């Protein structure tokens, strides 16, 4: 679950205040104009920014002041942040062990994660040999390896064409079902999510102004 109670961020250009209640396992889309506060909302939940006041509860624990690594959250950005000199396997390994010195069990987990996103045969490839959609699949698999119950997506597929976006969104829905993930997804294409989202939040001027159920 995700619960934000009067979470205030004193941004110089746009003061923000968020109240939010998302049940465990729900899938939520976040829409709004550029600069409205969508990414800031995710950053507050992930721990990349800290509020001036208010509380952030994640899975029944107060994480208002927790460091990002202490939170039950993984976050995927538009930039896939893959290291070009490392193979797919090594990039995935960074999700669980930065030293890249893996046990047999950890290696098996990496192979399973790669297979879950359709890249089981790409482990020895370098990122520059992958398509944009394949790179995002690697980044998604790395998030899943962290084994966190809350997944935050900040427009990760906006640079892809519509066909690839639809494929990636279908993959996300499948993985959420399999792993019982709670999902928050910032998007500019809410129509592509019809049938796979529990609610849509509209962020305007640093606040959640609307909530639509059952999209």
Curated annotation (Swiss-Prot):
Binding site for ATP: 32-39
Residue ranges of the TM segments: none
Any one annotated GO CC term: plasma membrane
GO MF term list: ABC-type thiamine transporter activity; ATP binding; ATP hydrolysis activity
Gene3D superfamilies attached to this UniProt entry: P-loop containing nucleotide triphosphate hydrolases (3.40.50.300)
PROSITE patterns: ABC_TRANSPORTER_1, ABC_TRANSPORTER_2, THIQ
Keywords assigned: ATP-binding, Cell inner membrane, Cell membrane, Membrane, Nucleotide-binding, Translocase, Transport
Coiled coil: none
Membrane topology: Peripheral membrane protein
Pfam families referenced in this protein's UniProt entry, alphabetically: ABC_tran (PF00005)
Enzyme Commission code(s) on record: 7.6.2.15
NCBIfam families in the cross-refs: thiQ
Function: Part of the ABC transporter complex ThiBPQ involved in thiamine import. Responsible for energy coupling to the transport system.
Subunit and interaction comment: The complex is composed of two ATP-binding proteins (ThiQ), two transmembrane proteins (ThiP) and a solute-binding protein (ThiB).
Similarity comment: Belongs to the ABC transporter superfamily. Thiamine importer (TC 3.A.1.19.1) family.
The name this protein goes by in its record: Thiamine import ATP-binding protein ThiQ
Name of the coding gene: thiQ
């Amino acid at each position: 679950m995700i619960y934000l109670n009067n979470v205030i961020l004193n941004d110089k250009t746009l003061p923000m205040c968020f109240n939010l209640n998302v049940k465990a396992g729900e899938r939520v889309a976040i829409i709004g104009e550029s600069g409205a506060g969508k990414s800031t909302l995710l950053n507050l939940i992930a721990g990349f920014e800290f509020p001036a006041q208010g509380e952030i509860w994640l899975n029944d624990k107060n994480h208002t002041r927790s460091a990002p690594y202490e939170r039950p959250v993984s976050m995927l950005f538009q930039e896939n942040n893959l290291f070009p000199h490392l193979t797919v396997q090594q990039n995935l390994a960074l999700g669980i062990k930065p030293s890249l010195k893996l046990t047999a069990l950890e290696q098996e987990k990496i192979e399973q994660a790669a297979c879950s996103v359709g890249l089981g045969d790409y482990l020895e490839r370098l990122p520059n040999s992958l398509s944009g959609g394949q790179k995002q699949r690697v980044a998604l698999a790395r998030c899943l390896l962290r084994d966190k119950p809350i997944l935050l997506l900040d427009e990760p597929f906006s640079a892809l064409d519509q066909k690839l976006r639809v494929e990636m969104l279908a993959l996300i829905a499948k993985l959420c079902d399999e792993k019982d993930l709670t999902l928050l997804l910032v998007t500019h294409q809410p129509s592509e999510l019809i049938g796979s989202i529990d609610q849509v939040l509209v962020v305007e001027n640093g606040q959640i102004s609307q909530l639509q159920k059952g999209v």
